[in-house]
Structures are given as structure tokens and as C-alpha cells.
């Protein structure tokens, strides 16, 4: 696999068997938005491709569970910090399961690594990289000769992203430990960690050595990732990561989607109208480094492309595909899966991979038109679809249930009851009643398909 490193702007070849990946996860004070979803599904695709390649992958995604935004929410509510963060961690993980994001091997929470953070600050203090102000302990960026080597911009370009509420030595200096009487005891005074320190301590505790890949949204490149890299370089005496990957923004009306801009579109809102697989397909449909503008019509088009996969599955009578063995050994046998894997190994070239997937679906249908009773052909297509589902992370559902998505239990019972009444009417040659029932269901966007094995139904797209 070759990946474009954000630091060097060059494609770097991954030629190791064992791969370590750390993805910056959410700050858990609210429901996750589509920006969070995109980062998760993009790097879940990376993980799936590596697993399909035969790599052994150690994957961590953290939770920032102590932060000014969480404390603000706590002050506005009657809940404890733990109650707030636990609720939103569960909410986030529910969203990730719906999007078919594989569960990380490690899910560190910042509050579980306070001692490791203090140890890191002690190392930095011992070597003269820190100083004290009235509100906390700060990192002196002027002492790090390689500062800004990750974001590759001069300080003037980056400085607009920084706040300078206290009189720091340098505008780019950042807090390592915030004094706060309500939190943790330390030799520096009671307080809590700075955001940039949290990730470094968690990475060092879990992986101990230089990461193969550090991933996150492009908005984290500066200052967050730059400041992480500086602390690891100066405190741990090593590179934090060999490859840095950053996914592009999700935008609404040309602006970055962000809770702070009040233009967030929550994952849960999207999932009220679209199933998780359709949302995953949409979020993967442009290259991970690209920005894209959220569009309902684009999401609907992604759903239509996904429909074609399930039409083929339905034609083959292919049921649910298990995702269980993805984390174990996956053997890629089909030619189409090998071709798509080769494409994705070039910096996750998703557009080319999805175009080839579309061609495969079309060609498979043409072959089945010619040889509808060819069992070997059908089995080969089924195996290919199963392998492709495990690579892309969509196409797992039972096809019949896929086309019935969004129908409640009560509605389902009513539909089945009407279908039985229609079947009975047809037996009695009461075609007026049978047609009336079909029209009644059609008005509710339910379409009926009469087959040799009985009548099946689907929910039509809005």
C-alpha cells in the first residue's frame, strides 16, 4: 500500500506486516455529526484494506472525555462529567455500528491516562521545554527546532488559528496542564491536562514506539497534530508517526461542518431518513483527502448505487453476509476483489474502485441474463459480493430486508395482513379487491412483486 503523507506531501509505501494506527476520536459532549462520521468511515476503509492485504493491524481511536466544552455542558446541566461523557460515548458507538465501522482494538479515554500525561509533562519540564503562567504549564515552541515541520507552513499562516488569552512567550505556545482546583493533584498544582497532551500520552502508553499511521481530520493538522508531534519529539525523543493522514471537511453551503459554527448535521438526523450503509457509501464516495459539500441529492444518488448491489443480491437470493471474520484472516479469491484491492492500495483511490464495482454489477447482471441457471456463475458472483462487502464495509444486509428498510413493526404487520387479503381475493377471482389493495399499498409507497413463491413487497424510494 502507498499513502500520501501530509507531512512530506509524498506517497510512502507501507511494506510492514504489523501496522499501528491511531485515529483522533471525538470530544464527547454532544452527538456526532457527519464530519465525525466521514473521518471514521474513511479510516475504517483503510483498516479493512490493510486487513484484506493480510496485515496485522493495531487500531486505536480515542475519546476526549475532559475538555472545556464538556465542562461547559456540565455547568449548564445537573449531570456529572462522567454521566455526560458516558452517554455520548455510547451514542457515538451506536452510530459507528450503524455505519459498519469496525470496533477499534483500543478505545482510550483521556481521563484514564492522567498519570501518563503528568509523566510526559515532567520529562518536558526536566529538559527545559516548559514554563509556568498563572493559569497553567505551557510548552515553549521556540525550544523545538522542528516545530511546524508537520504542517509545513510558516507561523504567520498558522497564527490566525490560535487564541492568545494569556501573555505567552510565543503566540504558538500551548498549555500542557491547566490549573483547576476541581480536578487532579500533581506536583505542578491541581489541574487537568491540555488537549494536545492527551493524545501523545495515550499513544505512548498503548503503542510505545513510533506509529505507522496517525490519522484525523484536516482541521487537526494545526495546531493539534503539530503540537502532538512536538511533545513526542521533545518528551519521548522520537517521531510520533511515520505517516500522517488527514481527511477533508464535510461542508454545508461551502462552509466546514462544525458544532462551533452551528451548522452541524448529526449522524442520527441522517439515519432517520437513510440506512447506515447508504450514508457510509455516500461518505466514502469521494477521496478521503477531498472536501465535499453535503447534498441530499448526492446522498440519494449514493443510495441508488447501493440499490444496484442489493438488486443483484436479491436476484441471487443471497442473504445476510457476516462481517465477523473481517478482523481475522480474510482470503481474497475473486478476480474483481483483487482488482479493487489493488486500486485501493494506491492511497485509497475510492472513485476508481467504485467505478469498477459499478461495472462488475452491470456485467454480472448481463451474464445472469445469458445464463440464469448457471450455478457456478451464481456462486462465483456470490463469493465476490461477500469479499467486496468486507472490503468496502457495505452490502452485508439481507436483500429483502434492505428493500423493506424504514418500515415499523406495526406497518409491517398491516402490510402482511393486506397481502394475505389480496392473495385470498385473487384465489376467489375478486380482482377488483386485489387491485384496490395494491393501490392502497402503493399510496403508502409499498410496491408488490408477485413471484412463483408468493408475493413479496418493497418500500419505494421517496
From Swiss-Prot:
UniProt-listed InterPro entries = Cys-tRNA-ligase, Cys-tRNA-synt_Ia_DALR, Cys-tRNA/MSH_ligase, Rossmann-like_a/b/a_fold, tRNA-synt_1_cat_dom, tRNAsynth_Ia_anticodon-bd
The protein's matches in SUPFAM superfamilies, at most eight in alphabetical order, are given as: Anticodon-binding domain of a subclass of class I aminoacyl-tRNA synthetases, Nucleotidylyl transferase
Compartments, record wording? Cytoplasm
EC number(s) per UniProt?
6.1.1.16
Q: Name one GO biological process term.
A: cysteinyl-tRNA aminoacylation
Give cofactor(s), names only: Zn(2+)
Question: Which positions does UniProt annotate for ATP binding?
Answer: 259
Task: Give the top-level enzyme category.
Answer: ligase
Q: Which Gene3D superfamilies match?
A: Cysteine-tRNA ligase, C-terminal anti-codon recognition domain, HUPs
**What's the catalysed reaction?**
tRNA(Cys) + L-cysteine + ATP = L-cysteinyl-tRNA(Cys) + AMP + diphosphate
Oligomeric and partner information? Monomer.
Q: What is this protein called?
A: Cysteine--tRNA ligase
The organism's lineage is: Bacteria, Pseudomonadati, Campylobacterota, Epsilonproteobacteria, Campylobacterales
Write the gene name: cysS
